[in-house]
Structures are given as C-alpha cells and as structure tokens.
Swiss-Prot record:
<feature type="region of interest" description="Constant region">
    <location>
        <begin position="1"/>
        <end position="361"/>
    </location>
</feature>
<protein>
    <recommendedName>
        <fullName>Shufflon protein B'</fullName>
    </recommendedName>
</protein>
<dbReference type="Pfam" id="PF04917">
    <property type="entry name" value="Shufflon_N"/>
</dbReference>
<dbReference type="InterPro" id="IPR007001">
    <property type="entry name" value="Shufflon_N"/>
</dbReference>
<keyword id="KW-0614">Plasmid</keyword>
<feature type="region of interest" description="Variable region">
    <location>
        <begin position="362"/>
        <end position="444"/>
    </location>
</feature>
<dbReference type="InterPro" id="IPR029017">
    <property type="entry name" value="Enolase-like_N"/>
</dbReference>
Length: 444
C-alpha cells in the first residue's frame, strides 16, 4: 500500500528538532547571562567590602590624612595598608578576578579644606564590559558606586553623578570600577571613631572603645558588672562587700566594719598594730595571744604560757605561785653581811657566793643567826653530869662543861652533843666526895 503522507511526517520531525535546538541555545544563553550576573554581583560585594574598610581606615586616621593630602594631591590607600592595619583580613587578594587593583585617593574638599573626600578606583588588569560596569555600579553598597568608561571620568550608577578623576589625582582606564566617598560619608566615618556606641556593632569593636579620658561631671556610674583597670584614685570612700588584690593595697587609712583576712603577712613599716576594747593579738589555731583588759597589765589569752629560748627581762618579775628553774638561780648583785636591808625576807649573796638573808633589817648569812648560850647544872656523888638544851628553833653548834669539888680535885670526863639541840657533859672527883658541873650549849 502506498503511503502518501510519509514526507510530511519527516518534515514535522525536523521542525520539532529545530525548535528544541533553538530552545537549548536560548536557555544556554540565559544560563550564561545568569552566571555572569552572579559573578559581577560577587565582584560588587568585594568592592563594597574593600570600600567599607577604606572608609573605616579614613575615619580612624582622619587627622593624619588631612596632614598628608591637599585639594589636588591625594593620600593613597592600598590593599596592603588595609590588611596591615586590620581593616581587611590577611587573606584578601590584592587584585580582583580581572586582575584589577583597588586604591583609594583621599583629597581635601576644595570648598572646605578641613574636610576630606575620596574616590576608590580600580586600575590595571582586563577591562570589564560596559554591561558588567553598569551592573556592578548598581550593586555596590558602600559609597556611591560607579565606573570609568572613557579613562578620564568616573560616572555613577544610572548616570547619577560624574566626576573627573583628575579632581582626586587618580589615573585609570576604560572598563574599570569607581566608588565615590563623599565629604558627608567620610565625616560620618570620622564621627564613628569618635562616638561611643551604647550597643555592640558587629565587626566594629572600635565603636565601643574610648580613646581619651572621660569626665562624668560628678555623676554616678551605676549598675557596672565589673571594673577592670590598671590603677584607681578615689578622693572619697570605697564601699564594697569583698575585695581581692593580687598586689599591694596602699592608703593613708582604712576602716573595716567586720574582718580583714590576709593570706600572707601584715606589716607596718613605721606604725603600730592598734586594737581597742580589751582586744589584742590572738592565734586562732592554738587559742593563745596577748591582750590588755586594764591600764597596767599585758595578759596572755586563756592563761597560756610564754616560751622562749632567749631571755625574759623586766624591772621586776613576780610569781604568784612557785618559781622554778631548770638549772641554777644566779644572783648578780652582792650584799655585805651586817649591812642594813629591807624588807625582811630578801635573799642575796656576798662576794664569796655565800647566801645572805635579810633578818630584822640586817643582812645575815643563812644558818648564822644570833648566838645563844644554854646552861644546865648538877651536883652528885663523885660522877656529876648534866645536859644543856637549846631553846625551840635553835640548833646546837658547840658546848662544854666546868667541874668543881670541895677539895679541888675533879676531872671533866665527857663532853659531847647529845642531840641536834643539846649538849651533855660529866665529871669524876676520883674520891668519895660530891662534885658539881655546869654544862654550856652554844645555840644558833
């Protein structure tokens, strides 16, 4: 069977394929334009970041740049300068994707030379197409974005402004980027560095930093979390709950209502450690120390003993109890036996070391009291004998006896101490007759 419509089918298939190919080519063009646009937007963001860093640098160094620029001679800011001063990260490249290098040209305003204005210009590398320049000029967010199309003039986005590059001492070529930083923009940057912000600004810690002294005009600084400082001078009182100091605390005087605790020593160079109200020094660990509770005596806390390997020296030393010595009692001054003394009961020594005591107002040797003679008499047949006894409290130190008879013949046959306080003696007449004896006891 003949097929009369076969040619028309082939024609329809070819037309469909042609349409598909046209759609693919059109879509590829749109995709390529999209990729280009995204790339130019990225370039615009990089230029915005660079311009923002230059703006901050100018604000920070406003006075310095005023001194290094004129209305026709610019101060030039480079990428290296921004990286070295921390306004750009160290990884920021010196050139963009087309090999162009950004620089800022800062000059004084011709109408008001006290103010600055600047132009950011790219130079070198490969020129951008006009479409890219127009797109990037609109997407730049810092300053007034623009471009250079004739190599001499910077033109703003949507042709909103136009400035000759020579006004800024800048040079470039066709197909390059330009950003205008007006006098008002840079004045705001300078104010940013001078103004102390109440809130944190991300990426701008310098806005919360003082660069000079602040005068509160006798007003308060309230609700401070922490004060970190190198030194502090106060003409009045400093009140607080706790204080920690890693170094020294100095002052003319200090008053504390409760306790002062130190981890180390407490020293006074030329003053006293003064306490009041019957208080003094106390060792908390062992419960000892010194205090005064009257105007006469320094007392030991809890009646603790005082121990030293050195000397304890004073005008007088009094013991209400016994006085002990682990060695000897050394009396340095001497007295003379027979000399007057007061009061009775004093103990001393003479120059030979003999012990003296004050008795009845006179220095006497110990054991050498007043002598007293005790006597006893007896009469008996041929062998008379007797014993003389000392008064109470006296001791016998010697003695003897005397014998007598009618005929004169009699002998002292015995004479001896018969006890600690008596002396005995006896006689012999050798004849049958009576004899008499008198016995003497020397008592002291």
């Amino acid at each position: 069977m003949k097929k009369y419509d076969r040619g028309w089918a082939s024609l329809e298939t070819g037309a469909a394929l042609l349409i598909v190919m046209l759609l693919i080519a059109w879509g590829a063009g749109i995709w390529q334009d999209y990729i280009q646009t995204k790339g130019w937007q990225t370039e615009a963001r990089l230029v915005s970041n660079w311009t923002s860093a230059a703006r901050s640098y100018i604000g920070k160094n406003y006075t310095t740049l005023q001194g290094s620029s004129t209305t026709t001679t610019p101060a030039v800011i480079t990428t290296t300068m921004l990286k070295n001063t921390g306004f750009l990260s160290s990884g920021f490249t010196e050139t963009n994707s087309e090999g162009q290098r950004l620089q800022a040209y800062v000059v004084r305003n011709a109408q008001n030379p006290e103010l600055l204005q600047a132009m950011v210009v790219s130079s070198g590398g490969t020129p951008y197409p006009v479409k890219a320049l127009i797109q990037m000029a609109k997407d730049i967010t810092t300053g007034l974005g623009g471009y250079i199309q004739d190599g001499k003039t910077a033109t703003g986005a949507l042709r909103s402004w136009s400035v000759a590059l020579s006004n800024y001492g800048a040079k470039s070529g066709n197909g390059h980027i330009a950003v205008l930083l007006s006098t008002d923009e840079l004045s705001g940057a300078a104010e940013d560095t001078d103004r102390l912000y109440r809130f944190q600004v991300n990426g701008r810690p310098d806005l919360n930093k003082m660069h000079t002294a602040i005068d509160m005009g006798s007003n308060n600084l309230n609700n401070v979390g922490a004060v970190n400082a190198q030194t502090g001078n106060f003409s009045g009182n400093v009140n607080g709950v706790n204080g920690t100091f890693s170094g020294q605390v100095k002052g003319n005087s200090g008053n504390f209502d409760v306790n002062v605790t130190a981890g180390g020593d407490i020293r006074s160079n030329n003053g006293w450690l003064i306490t009041r109200n019957s208080k003094g020094w106390l060792n908390e660990t062992h419960g000892g120390g010194f205090y005064m509770s009257d105007g006469s005596w320094v007392r030991s806390v809890n009646n603790k003993g005082i121990y030293t390997g050195g000397q304890v020296k004073g005008g007088t030393v009094r013991a209400d109890g016994r006085l002990y010595t682990g060695e000897y009692l050394q009396l340095e001054r001497t007295a003379v036996a027979g000399a007057s003394c007061s009061p009775n009961g004093l103990v001393g020594r003479d120059n030979t070391g003999a012990i003296l005591s004050c008795q009845s107002g006179t220095w006497r040797k110990v054991g050498s009291g007043e002598l007293q003679i005790a006597t006893a008499q007896a009469t008996g047949w041929r062998f008379p004998g007797a014993t003389a006894t000392c008064p109470t409290g006296k001791r016998v130190t010697g003695g003897g006896g005397i014998c007598t008879s009618r005929t004169g013949y009699i002998w002292l046959t015995r004479s001896f101490p018969s006890a600690n306080n008596s002396w005995s003696a006896a006689c012999d007449t050798t004849e049958d007759q009576n004899g008499s004896i008198t016995v003497y006891a020397i008592c002291q």
